[in-house]
Amino acid sequence: MAVPLGALWAWSVLDKAVISYYSRKYKPVPLPERPNYSHKDVSIIVPTIDTEDTFTECMRLWLKANPREIVIATVERNKARVEQLIEPLRQQHADKIMVVTAALANKRHQLIVGVKSARGKIFALVDDDVYWHVDSVVPYLLAPFEDAEVGAVAGIQSAEVPPERQDVRVITPWEATATFDLCQWKGSREVHFAADGGCWCLSARTLFIRASILQDQSFANAYTQEVIGRRLVNTADDVVLTGLVFDRGWKVSIQNTPEAEVTTNIPRDHRLVWQVLRWDRGNFRTFLGYMLVSPGYRKMMQRHPYTTWKMVERLARPIWAFAYVWAWLQTLYTAPWIAYAYIAWMAFGWKGWLPTYREFLKRYPYCGRQMWAPLLMDYIGPIVDIYVYLTINNDDWLTRRADTKDIED
Protein backbone atom coordinates (compact mmCIF):
# COMPACT_ATOMS: atom_id res chain seq x y z
CA MET A 1 0.00 0.00 0.00
CA ALA A 2 2.99 2.33 -0.46
CA VAL A 3 1.91 3.10 -4.04
CA PRO A 4 -0.55 5.95 -3.18
CA LEU A 5 2.04 7.68 -0.99
CA GLY A 6 4.67 7.18 -3.67
CA ALA A 7 2.40 8.75 -6.28
CA LEU A 8 1.64 11.73 -4.05
CA TRP A 9 5.34 12.04 -3.22
CA ALA A 10 6.24 12.09 -6.92
CA TRP A 11 3.53 14.69 -7.57
CA SER A 12 4.94 16.86 -4.79
CA VAL A 13 8.46 16.67 -6.27
CA LEU A 14 7.11 17.57 -9.72
CA ASP A 15 5.16 20.49 -8.28
CA LYS A 16 8.26 21.85 -6.54
CA ALA A 17 10.27 21.46 -9.75
CA VAL A 18 7.69 23.47 -11.70
CA ILE A 19 7.62 26.16 -9.01
CA SER A 20 11.41 26.34 -9.02
CA TYR A 21 11.49 26.66 -12.81
CA TYR A 22 8.99 29.51 -12.96
CA SER A 23 10.60 31.25 -9.99
CA ARG A 24 13.89 31.38 -11.92
CA LYS A 25 12.05 32.48 -15.06
CA TYR A 26 10.39 35.46 -13.38
CA LYS A 27 11.89 38.89 -14.11
CA PRO A 28 10.52 42.26 -12.93
CA VAL A 29 10.03 45.05 -15.45
CA PRO A 30 13.06 47.40 -15.46
CA LEU A 31 12.79 51.17 -15.33
CA PRO A 32 12.33 52.71 -18.79
CA GLU A 33 14.89 55.20 -20.07
CA ARG A 34 12.18 57.69 -21.03
CA PRO A 35 9.09 56.95 -18.93
CA ASN A 36 5.66 58.06 -20.08
CA TYR A 37 4.43 58.32 -16.48
CA SER A 38 5.83 60.02 -13.40
CA HIS A 39 4.84 60.71 -9.80
CA LYS A 40 2.83 63.71 -11.05
CA ASP A 41 0.40 61.29 -12.74
CA VAL A 42 -0.32 59.33 -9.55
CA SER A 43 -3.35 59.89 -7.32
CA ILE A 44 -3.20 57.89 -4.08
CA ILE A 45 -6.64 56.73 -2.89
CA VAL A 46 -6.91 55.46 0.69
CA PRO A 47 -10.17 53.96 2.01
CA THR A 48 -10.13 54.01 5.82
CA ILE A 49 -12.28 53.40 8.90
CA ASP A 50 -11.18 52.95 12.52
CA THR A 51 -7.91 54.54 11.41
CA GLU A 52 -4.81 53.52 13.38
CA ASP A 53 -2.30 55.89 15.00
CA THR A 54 0.34 54.85 12.47
CA PHE A 55 -1.61 56.55 9.68
CA THR A 56 0.32 59.80 10.14
CA GLU A 57 3.65 58.10 9.48
CA CYS A 58 2.22 56.21 6.50
CA MET A 59 0.94 59.50 5.07
CA ARG A 60 4.33 61.14 5.58
CA LEU A 61 6.02 58.41 3.54
CA TRP A 62 3.43 58.60 0.75
CA LEU A 63 3.84 62.37 0.55
CA LYS A 64 7.60 61.91 0.36
CA ALA A 65 7.00 60.11 -2.95
CA ASN A 66 5.49 63.39 -4.22
CA PRO A 67 2.25 62.11 -5.78
CA ARG A 68 -0.20 64.43 -7.49
CA GLU A 69 -2.60 64.08 -4.57
CA ILE A 70 -3.80 61.84 -1.75
CA VAL A 71 -7.55 61.24 -1.54
CA ILE A 72 -8.64 59.80 1.81
CA ALA A 73 -12.06 58.15 1.57
CA THR A 74 -13.66 57.64 4.97
CA VAL A 75 -17.12 57.90 6.57
CA GLU A 76 -18.61 60.72 8.62
CA ARG A 77 -18.12 59.00 11.97
CA ASN A 78 -14.38 58.60 11.26
CA LYS A 79 -13.70 61.97 9.61
CA ALA A 80 -12.64 63.79 12.79
CA ARG A 81 -10.21 60.98 13.57
CA VAL A 82 -8.65 61.26 10.10
CA GLU A 83 -8.41 65.05 10.34
CA GLN A 84 -6.65 64.72 13.69
CA LEU A 85 -4.09 62.26 12.31
CA ILE A 86 -3.25 64.29 9.20
CA GLU A 87 -3.11 67.66 11.01
CA PRO A 88 0.71 67.54 11.42
CA LEU A 89 1.03 67.28 7.62
CA ARG A 90 -1.63 69.79 6.59
CA GLN A 91 0.45 72.95 6.73
CA GLN A 92 3.12 71.73 4.32
CA HIS A 93 0.91 69.60 2.06
CA ALA A 94 -2.54 71.22 2.19
CA ASP A 95 -2.80 71.32 -1.61
CA LYS A 96 -2.20 67.56 -1.91
CA ILE A 97 -4.50 66.13 0.76
CA MET A 98 -8.23 65.70 0.25
CA VAL A 99 -10.69 64.00 2.63
CA VAL A 100 -13.97 62.75 1.17
CA THR A 101 -16.76 60.81 2.86
CA ALA A 102 -18.88 57.89 1.70
CA ALA A 103 -22.38 57.13 2.93
CA LEU A 104 -21.41 53.54 3.74
CA ALA A 105 -18.44 52.09 5.65
CA ASN A 106 -17.76 49.61 2.87
CA LYS A 107 -14.26 49.52 1.38
CA ARG A 108 -15.45 49.10 -2.20
CA HIS A 109 -17.92 51.98 -1.95
CA GLN A 110 -15.38 54.22 -0.24
CA LEU A 111 -12.87 53.47 -2.98
CA ILE A 112 -15.27 54.50 -5.74
CA VAL A 113 -16.09 57.72 -3.86
CA GLY A 114 -12.35 58.42 -3.79
CA VAL A 115 -12.07 57.64 -7.51
CA LYS A 116 -14.67 60.31 -8.32
CA SER A 117 -12.48 62.95 -6.67
CA ALA A 118 -9.09 61.84 -8.00
CA ARG A 119 -7.52 63.47 -11.07
CA GLY A 120 -4.42 61.41 -11.90
CA LYS A 121 -3.85 59.12 -14.88
CA ILE A 122 -2.80 56.30 -12.54
CA PHE A 123 -4.56 55.54 -9.27
CA ALA A 124 -2.55 54.04 -6.41
CA LEU A 125 -4.98 52.11 -4.19
CA VAL A 126 -3.31 51.97 -0.79
CA ASP A 127 -4.35 50.52 2.56
CA ASP A 128 -4.20 52.89 5.53
CA ASP A 129 -1.52 50.87 7.36
CA VAL A 130 1.05 50.57 4.57
CA TYR A 131 4.54 52.11 4.56
CA TRP A 132 6.56 53.14 1.51
CA HIS A 133 10.03 53.10 3.06
CA VAL A 134 11.91 53.03 -0.25
CA ASP A 135 11.83 56.00 -2.62
CA SER A 136 11.66 53.75 -5.69
CA VAL A 137 8.15 52.34 -5.10
CA VAL A 138 6.39 54.75 -7.47
CA PRO A 139 8.77 54.54 -10.46
CA TYR A 140 8.99 50.74 -10.26
CA LEU A 141 5.22 50.31 -10.04
CA LEU A 142 4.76 52.73 -12.94
CA ALA A 143 7.29 50.97 -15.18
CA PRO A 144 4.96 48.16 -16.43
CA PHE A 145 2.45 50.75 -17.67
CA GLU A 146 4.81 51.47 -20.58
CA ASP A 147 3.04 48.42 -22.04
CA ALA A 148 -0.32 49.79 -23.17
CA GLU A 149 -1.99 46.42 -22.47
CA VAL A 150 -1.12 46.46 -18.75
CA GLY A 151 -4.00 47.71 -16.62
CA ALA A 152 -2.83 47.09 -13.05
CA VAL A 153 0.42 46.49 -11.15
CA ALA A 154 1.42 45.40 -7.64
CA GLY A 155 4.76 44.89 -5.89
CA ILE A 156 6.09 43.07 -2.82
CA GLN A 157 4.39 43.29 0.58
CA SER A 158 6.32 42.49 3.76
CA ALA A 159 5.61 42.79 7.46
CA GLU A 160 6.24 46.07 9.26
CA VAL A 161 7.89 44.99 12.52
CA PRO A 162 8.88 48.02 14.65
CA PRO A 163 12.45 47.93 16.09
CA GLU A 164 11.18 47.48 19.64
CA ARG A 165 9.40 44.28 18.59
CA GLN A 166 12.36 42.78 16.73
CA ASP A 167 13.24 40.77 19.82
CA VAL A 168 12.78 37.04 20.44
CA ARG A 169 11.43 37.89 23.91
CA VAL A 170 8.83 40.31 22.58
CA ILE A 171 7.48 39.14 19.23
CA THR A 172 4.34 37.01 19.44
CA PRO A 173 3.45 33.78 17.61
CA TRP A 174 0.76 35.75 15.76
CA GLU A 175 3.31 38.23 14.40
CA ALA A 176 5.70 35.45 13.38
CA THR A 177 2.91 33.66 11.53
CA ALA A 178 1.78 36.81 9.71
CA THR A 179 5.36 37.66 8.75
CA PHE A 180 6.02 34.16 7.42
CA ASP A 181 2.73 34.13 5.50
CA LEU A 182 3.64 37.35 3.68
CA CYS A 183 7.03 35.91 2.73
CA GLN A 184 5.46 32.79 1.27
CA TRP A 185 2.75 34.70 -0.56
CA LYS A 186 5.05 36.96 -2.53
CA GLY A 187 6.92 33.91 -3.84
CA SER A 188 3.76 32.24 -5.11
CA ARG A 189 2.62 35.39 -6.93
CA GLU A 190 5.77 35.65 -9.02
CA VAL A 191 5.49 31.97 -9.95
CA HIS A 192 1.88 32.32 -11.15
CA PHE A 193 2.73 35.44 -13.12
CA ALA A 194 5.82 33.91 -14.75
CA ALA A 195 3.84 30.78 -15.67
CA ASP A 196 0.93 32.35 -17.55
CA GLY A 197 0.62 36.05 -16.70
CA GLY A 198 -2.03 35.27 -14.11
CA CYS A 199 -2.46 36.29 -10.50
CA TRP A 200 -4.99 35.36 -7.81
CA CYS A 201 -4.93 38.78 -6.27
CA LEU A 202 -3.19 42.11 -6.75
CA SER A 203 -3.10 43.09 -3.10
CA ALA A 204 -4.77 46.40 -2.29
CA ARG A 205 -2.05 47.16 0.22
CA THR A 206 -0.54 48.98 -2.76
CA LEU A 207 -2.06 48.49 -6.19
CA PHE A 208 -1.49 50.80 -9.16
CA ILE A 209 -4.26 50.82 -11.78
CA ARG A 210 -5.12 52.93 -14.81
CA ALA A 211 -7.62 55.62 -13.88
CA SER A 212 -9.75 54.86 -16.93
CA ILE A 213 -10.52 51.35 -15.63
CA LEU A 214 -12.03 52.51 -12.34
CA GLN A 215 -13.72 55.51 -13.95
CA ASP A 216 -15.72 53.18 -16.20
CA GLN A 217 -19.21 53.15 -14.68
CA SER A 218 -19.89 49.54 -15.69
CA PHE A 219 -16.70 48.48 -13.89
CA ALA A 220 -17.65 50.49 -10.80
CA ASN A 221 -21.14 48.97 -10.79
CA ALA A 222 -19.82 45.41 -11.04
CA TYR A 223 -17.33 46.15 -8.27
CA THR A 224 -19.73 47.74 -5.80
CA GLN A 225 -22.94 45.78 -6.45
CA GLU A 226 -21.82 42.21 -5.73
CA VAL A 227 -24.22 40.60 -3.26
CA ILE A 228 -24.52 37.56 -1.00
CA GLY A 229 -28.23 36.87 -0.87
CA ARG A 230 -29.44 40.46 -0.62
CA ARG A 231 -26.46 41.92 1.23
CA LEU A 232 -23.84 44.06 -0.49
CA VAL A 233 -20.42 42.45 -0.26
CA ASN A 234 -17.68 44.33 1.57
CA THR A 235 -14.73 41.93 1.69
CA ALA A 236 -12.48 40.45 -1.05
CA ASP A 237 -12.17 43.90 -2.62
CA ASP A 238 -8.76 43.30 -4.20
CA VAL A 239 -9.46 39.73 -5.36
CA VAL A 240 -12.62 40.84 -7.15
CA LEU A 241 -10.92 43.90 -8.62
CA THR A 242 -8.13 41.69 -10.03
CA GLY A 243 -10.68 39.40 -11.68
CA LEU A 244 -12.58 42.33 -13.19
CA VAL A 245 -9.36 43.71 -14.67
CA PHE A 246 -8.72 40.38 -16.40
CA ASP A 247 -12.35 40.08 -17.51
CA ARG A 248 -12.05 43.35 -19.40
CA GLY A 249 -9.06 42.16 -21.39
CA TRP A 250 -6.26 43.88 -19.50
CA LYS A 251 -2.96 42.33 -18.47
CA VAL A 252 -1.44 42.78 -15.03
CA SER A 253 2.16 42.93 -13.85
CA ILE A 254 3.94 41.81 -10.68
CA GLN A 255 6.99 43.79 -9.55
CA ASN A 256 8.59 41.41 -7.04
CA THR A 257 11.71 43.45 -6.49
CA PRO A 258 13.08 45.24 -3.38
CA GLU A 259 12.68 48.57 -5.17
CA ALA A 260 8.89 48.06 -5.18
CA GLU A 261 8.57 46.71 -1.64
CA VAL A 262 6.03 48.11 0.81
CA THR A 263 5.43 47.01 4.39
CA THR A 264 2.22 46.66 6.36
CA ASN A 265 1.14 46.48 9.98
CA ILE A 266 0.44 42.94 11.18
CA PRO A 267 -1.77 41.69 14.04
CA ARG A 268 -0.02 41.02 17.33
CA ASP A 269 -2.79 38.86 18.76
CA HIS A 270 -5.69 36.60 17.81
CA ARG A 271 -7.03 39.19 15.36
CA LEU A 272 -4.82 37.41 12.82
CA VAL A 273 -7.37 34.56 12.91
CA TRP A 274 -10.22 36.96 12.03
CA GLN A 275 -8.10 38.42 9.23
CA VAL A 276 -7.33 34.98 7.78
CA LEU A 277 -10.98 33.93 7.96
CA ARG A 278 -12.07 37.11 6.16
CA TRP A 279 -9.48 36.62 3.42
CA ASP A 280 -10.23 32.93 2.92
CA ARG A 281 -14.00 33.37 2.81
CA GLY A 282 -13.64 36.10 0.22
CA ASN A 283 -11.11 34.12 -1.80
CA PHE A 284 -13.17 30.93 -1.78
CA ARG A 285 -16.38 32.73 -2.81
CA THR A 286 -14.55 34.50 -5.61
CA PHE A 287 -12.67 31.43 -6.85
CA LEU A 288 -15.84 29.32 -6.87
CA GLY A 289 -17.58 32.10 -8.78
CA TYR A 290 -14.78 32.10 -11.35
CA MET A 291 -15.03 28.33 -11.82
CA LEU A 292 -18.78 27.81 -11.75
CA VAL A 293 -20.33 31.08 -12.94
CA SER A 294 -18.19 33.64 -14.75
CA PRO A 295 -15.97 33.42 -16.69
CA GLY A 296 -16.17 29.64 -16.06
CA TYR A 297 -13.56 26.93 -15.62
CA ARG A 298 -12.94 26.40 -19.35
CA LYS A 299 -12.27 30.06 -20.07
CA MET A 300 -10.14 30.35 -16.94
CA MET A 301 -7.99 27.43 -18.13
CA GLN A 302 -7.64 29.01 -21.56
CA ARG A 303 -6.64 32.33 -20.05
CA HIS A 304 -4.35 31.27 -17.18
CA PRO A 305 -3.98 27.47 -17.01
CA TYR A 306 -1.34 27.22 -14.28
CA THR A 307 -2.90 29.87 -12.06
CA THR A 308 -6.33 28.26 -12.48
CA TRP A 309 -5.00 24.84 -11.54
CA LYS A 310 -3.41 26.31 -8.42
CA MET A 311 -6.76 27.91 -7.62
CA VAL A 312 -8.42 24.50 -7.83
CA GLU A 313 -5.68 23.02 -5.64
CA ARG A 314 -6.29 25.71 -3.05
CA LEU A 315 -10.03 25.08 -3.00
CA ALA A 316 -9.41 21.33 -2.67
CA ARG A 317 -6.79 21.55 0.10
CA PRO A 318 -8.85 19.55 2.65
CA ILE A 319 -9.20 16.71 0.12
CA TRP A 320 -5.48 16.76 -0.67
CA ALA A 321 -4.64 16.77 3.03
CA PHE A 322 -6.92 13.80 3.70
CA ALA A 323 -5.34 11.91 0.79
CA TYR A 324 -1.83 12.49 2.14
CA VAL A 325 -2.75 11.47 5.69
CA TRP A 326 -4.59 8.34 4.50
CA ALA A 327 -1.73 7.31 2.19
CA TRP A 328 0.88 7.88 4.90
CA LEU A 329 -1.01 5.85 7.52
CA GLN A 330 -1.51 3.00 5.05
CA THR A 331 2.20 3.05 4.23
CA LEU A 332 3.16 3.21 7.91
CA TYR A 333 1.26 -0.04 8.42
CA THR A 334 2.66 -1.90 5.39
CA ALA A 335 6.09 -0.31 4.75
CA PRO A 336 7.04 1.86 7.74
CA TRP A 337 10.51 2.71 6.45
CA ILE A 338 8.95 4.43 3.41
CA ALA A 339 6.57 6.36 5.66
CA TYR A 340 9.47 7.54 7.84
CA ALA A 341 11.55 8.39 4.78
CA TYR A 342 8.71 10.55 3.50
CA ILE A 343 8.56 12.49 6.79
CA ALA A 344 12.34 12.94 6.71
CA TRP A 345 12.15 14.24 3.15
CA MET A 346 9.33 16.64 4.08
CA ALA A 347 11.46 17.98 6.93
CA PHE A 348 14.95 18.07 5.42
CA GLY A 349 14.55 17.51 1.67
CA TRP A 350 14.26 19.90 -1.25
CA LYS A 351 12.23 22.94 -0.16
CA GLY A 352 11.28 21.07 3.02
CA TRP A 353 10.33 22.59 6.37
CA LEU A 354 13.88 23.08 7.63
CA PRO A 355 15.35 24.73 4.50
CA THR A 356 12.26 26.94 4.14
CA TYR A 357 12.29 28.11 7.75
CA ARG A 358 16.06 28.57 7.75
CA GLU A 359 15.78 30.89 4.75
CA PHE A 360 13.01 32.85 6.46
CA LEU A 361 15.02 33.22 9.68
CA LYS A 362 17.96 34.73 7.80
CA ARG A 363 15.82 37.82 7.31
CA TYR A 364 13.74 37.57 10.50
CA PRO A 365 16.03 35.95 13.13
CA TYR A 366 13.92 37.30 15.99
CA CYS A 367 11.07 34.97 14.94
CA GLY A 368 13.13 31.90 15.83
CA ARG A 369 11.38 30.97 19.07
CA GLN A 370 7.97 31.27 17.48
CA MET A 371 8.50 29.16 14.36
CA TRP A 372 6.23 26.49 15.78
CA ALA A 373 3.32 28.85 15.06
CA PRO A 374 3.70 29.08 11.24
CA LEU A 375 4.24 25.31 11.13
CA LEU A 376 1.06 24.75 13.14
CA MET A 377 -0.85 27.17 10.93
CA ASP A 378 0.26 25.27 7.83
CA TYR A 379 -0.96 21.96 9.17
CA ILE A 380 -4.27 23.06 10.63
CA GLY A 381 -4.97 24.99 7.42
CA PRO A 382 -7.13 22.23 5.88
CA ILE A 383 -9.27 22.16 9.05
CA VAL A 384 -9.65 25.94 8.88
CA ASP A 385 -10.69 25.54 5.23
CA ILE A 386 -13.57 23.28 6.23
CA TYR A 387 -14.78 25.92 8.70
CA VAL A 388 -14.44 28.54 5.95
CA TYR A 389 -16.65 26.47 3.64
CA LEU A 390 -19.26 26.09 6.39
CA THR A 391 -19.32 29.87 7.00
CA ILE A 392 -18.57 31.05 3.46
CA ASN A 393 -21.51 33.49 3.34
CA ASN A 394 -20.26 35.37 6.39
CA ASP A 395 -19.04 38.69 4.97
CA ASP A 396 -18.19 40.39 8.27
CA TRP A 397 -14.97 42.43 8.20
CA LEU A 398 -14.24 41.22 11.76
CA THR A 399 -11.22 43.46 12.49
CA ARG A 400 -12.95 46.82 11.79
CA ARG A 401 -16.50 48.19 12.16
CA ALA A 402 -17.77 48.07 8.60
CA ASP A 403 -21.41 48.71 7.70
CA THR A 404 -23.81 46.18 6.24
CA LYS A 405 -26.53 47.02 3.75
CA ASP A 406 -29.16 44.98 1.91
CA ILE A 407 -30.03 45.82 -1.69
CA GLU A 408 -33.32 47.60 -2.19
CA ASP A 409 -36.25 46.10 -4.10
Curated annotation (Swiss-Prot):
The glycosylation sites annotated in the UniProt record are N36
What residues form the membrane-spanning segments? 319-339
For this UniProt entry, the molecular function terms from Gene Ontology, in alphabetical order, are: glycosyltransferase activity
State the source organism's domain of life. Answer: Eukaryota
- Main subcellular location of this protein, as a coarse class: membrane
- Tell me where in or outside the cell this protein is found: Membrane
Its annotated pathway reads: Secondary metabolite biosynthesis
Keyword tags: Glycoprotein, Glycosyltransferase, Membrane, Transferase, Transmembrane, Transmembrane helix
A GO term from the CC aspect: membrane
Pfam families for this protein: Glyco_tranf_2_3
| Bilayer topology term | Single-pass membrane protein
InterPro entries given in the database record? Glycosyltrans_GT2/GT47, Nucleotide-diphossugar_trans
**Signal peptide interval:** none
EC assignment: the record states 2.4.1.-
The UniProt family comment states: Belongs to the GT2 glycosyltransferase family.
Q: What does this protein do?
A: NDP-glycosyltransferase; part of the gene cluster that mediates the biosynthesis of luteodienoside A, a glycosylated polyketide consisting of an unusual 1-O-beta-D-glucopyranosyl-myo-inositol (glucinol) ester of 3-hydroxy-2,2,4-trimethylocta-4,6-dienoic acid. LtbB likely serves as a glucinol synthase by transferring D-glucose to myo-inositol using NDP-glucose as a substrate. The ltbA carnitine O-acyltransferase (cAT) domain uses glucinol produced by the glycosyltransferase ltbB as an offloading substrate to release luteodienoside A from the HR-PKS.
Q: Name it.
A: NDP-glycosyltransferase ltbB
| Name of encoding gene | ltbB
